[in-house]
Each structure stands twice: as C-alpha cells, then as structure tokens.
Amino acid sequence: NGKRKFINSGELHYFRIPRSQWKDRLLKCKRAFLNTLGAYIAWNWHEEKEGKFNFEGDRDLDKWISLAEEVGLFIFIRPGPYICSEWDMGGFPNWLIPKDCELRSLEPNFMKYCIRYLDKVNKIIKPHLITKGGKIFLYQVENEFEVGDIPYHLKLKEIVEKDGIDVPICTNENAWVRGTDIIEGPDPYLRSWLISDAMIKIKDLIKTQPDKPPFAPEIGTCMIGWFYGQLPFSDGYRPPELDEANLKGLIAAGISGFNWYMYHGGTNIGYWTARNIATSYDFDAPIKEWGELGKRYYISRRIGGFLESFEEELSE
C-alpha cells in the first residue's frame, strides 16, 4: 500500500477452529494490535478424496480470508504444499501414499498433483492479493525444508507466479535459498533460557540476506513439551515473560516483522492430528483453545501497542 509496515502477525488455522468462531478469534487478534494474520492452508483438508475438492462450511477458505480482511488484518498466506503444523502428513493427502510419489521434490508424479492443488487454492487467493485490492501481501511456499533443494523451491515459485500470484514469495527455515528471488526467514524458537540464541539468528539473517526484509515466519509461544526435551521446561510450560523478553530482543536485533506461532491454536478434531500429537493444540497461546485470553495475550497487546506507536521508526 506504499507505506512501510512492521509485520505484527499471529498464526491461526481455520481448520482447527469452528467456522462459527472465526470472526471472534480474528477480532481478538485485531484488538491486540496485530496487523496481520498468518494462515496455513492444509491440502488434505480440501482434497480428502483424490480429485474432489471441498471449500464449503468449515473448509470455506474464501470466507476465512474475507473475514480477516473485514476486521482489518493483512494476510500472510501459507499453502505449502507441505505445512508440517503437527497436522496429519503435514497437509499431504493420504491418497498420495500408493501413488509412488517422491514427496517434496521435482518428481513429475508428485508435481502433477501439487500443481493441481495449487491451481485450485490460488484461484481463491488471487482476488484477495494486495495488488488486486485485497489484503494478502506475502505468500509462503514449502515449510522448514532446512536442507536446500533450491530448484524445487524455485519451481514452486514459478508455479504460483504462473497462477497470477504477484506478491513477494518467501519460505522459512531454509537458509540455502538466500541469494535467490525467494525471501527466507528463520523460525527463532526458544529452546533454552537464552534469548540471545534467537537474536543471533536474526542478526545472521540481516548479514546474509541484506537485500530483503528480516522477517521471522514463526516465533514460538509455549509450543509443545516434547519439542523442548529437558531444557528447561520438560512439561511444555515456560513463563510468558520469557516470550516477552524474546520479542523485545528480536526487535532490538533489527527484525522487521514476525508471526506468532500459535496466536490461537485451536483443536485437532477427529483424526487430523499428526503422530504423537494431542487433540488439543492450545500451545499456551495468547488466545486459549476455548477462546479465553491468556497471559501472553496481554504481553502481545503491550508490545503491539508499542509497535504501532513507533512503526515508522522501527520500519526504517
């Protein structure tokens, strides 16, 4: 929109929230001074059966995006095709298993199904792009690939651009793509008491990708216990004040935006959860699984108010 923005984003998943509660959760984000919604799209949520796409009811992606726009949020859209998200097969439909596909690769059989899926969701996304008067300003391909395969990532970029997606393309946790036309951002999760660990990631990003904005596609809230082992919160809990310190450290390190993961976790209904993941996806997030405002919400709101007040200075 021609103005510099500090991206203060929160991740919410329509596939973990009943449609009747979508607007309530989005309004709570807006009231905490968030300006952006981070949103995965789960392929298998829409193509549970091969070739039969469903975008109705709780799967109404267009309505989800429209509600975010209605409450005044920009949108950071993340269609994968792989999303992880502790979701069944990371979003891949299970009918891909007998297809003898090499997932997350340029293997032709996989790419055939991948292109069909992306074509479908991009038709919904395209009218909502900021270049078309909507609110989607950033589009992520893949997710936490970590170890390269630049041609695969560039092919995904080519596919979505062919579909008319003309906003910046990014990915996360794959430093190998730095130096290409894809914006790369780390996920500076805290796995110890040292907030300097996350700050080091951002400072390295600024140094190695100086021509692109230093953005973190995910910063963790409490996460889930087994991600952290025994250091130092084996029960999965950590003080909200540690997240506050981490956010302030990232801002001081020069970050231009971040996406809370999760801002509202919701619920893994039915059998959609990944292996070893509970039905609850609460995450001890700012907005609790049942919609109550947790301690992190008020921390986020204080920081959000600060970011909004000094956005121009912080976005230089």
What is the role of each PLM region?
Residues 177-229, 244-247, 287:
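Glycoside hydrolase catalytic-domain groove-lining segments
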Residues 1-13, 218-228:
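N-terminal small/glycine-rich loop or linker at the start of catalytic domains
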Residues 4-8, 33-35, 69-75, 130-137, ...:
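Short, well-ordered coil/turn segments that N-cap beta-strands
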Residues 37-44, 78-88, 137-142, 173-176, ...:
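Short, solvent-exposed turn/loop segments enriched in Gly/Ser/Thr/Pro and often Arg
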Residues 99, 110-140, 146-158, 164-166, ...:
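Carbohydrate-binding surfaces of carbohydrate-active enzymes
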Residues 15-31, 240-248:
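Short, acidic/polar
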Residues 51-59, 70, 81-108, 112, ...:
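Aromatic- and acidic-residue-enriched segments that line the glycan-binding/catalytic groove
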Residues 22-88, 94, 156-162:
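Aromatic-lined substrate-binding rim segments of carbohydrate-active enzymes
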